[in-house]
Amino acid sequence: LATLAATAQPAKQEAFQPLPGGFLHVPMNDLNALHQAVYNNLADVCAVMIEPVQGEAGVYPWDPDTLYDVAQFCRKNGLLLIVDEVQSGIFRCGEFPFAFQNLGITPDIITMAKGIASGFPMGACAARIEVAEAFEPGDHGSTFGGSNLAMAAAHATLVTLSRGHYDDRVTEVGDYFTEKLAQVEGVTEVRGMGLMLGADLEEGIDAHKVVAQGLEEGFLLNATGSNTLRFLPPLIVTETEIDKLIDALPGMIAAVRE
């Protein structure tokens, strides 16, 4: 429930009210708004939590200079910097295991899930030693935590990734995918990092209808808004597989264009 409270999307929260309080939301890349929110509530603020690449919002990477300033602001004011890498972590964004490493900051706490066990239910939280010492046994637990199967899936995933040179591969294929998406008729903007990409569609093209059309044609797509497609392919995706989607995407868009 605290995780739901942290999101800035009311639609995700409505079915689970009442939620824990204590979260303030400010616009991404707006340092002045962050300053104001913190200084107006300084006695009650303990941390700043960010996604290096916002996923549900439409795949928006942070501006590196602004994020660096956020990290410095946290250090100056004694605030913990928490980075949510649930979507963007585990080599999803290319060169490094975590997206924040592409952006020149060092967080105090990292949350991760999804890719850590190749989609098997698994989550983890990492922290600097000084921060982790605040945890006592039982403070952060789960009824189903520590599943042997989940641990085995995560171990196999991390061993495979550490041996597979996915850092260079994801960056290379991600650049290829970005370039190809930008050439598709009906796409107005492509953004993201590595193999975490978002593509905005022209006005009048419903992204959710494109997703439905894609499913009929054998493509599993995702929409994060009325006109934004999100692409999170497997890290082993090939240029040939990307080409198949790129060849089919104009037809999907044309089929639903109003």
Predicted regions located by residue number:
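Conserved N-terminal phosphate-binding loop of PLP-dependent enzymes in the Aspartate aminotransferase
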Residues: L1-E258
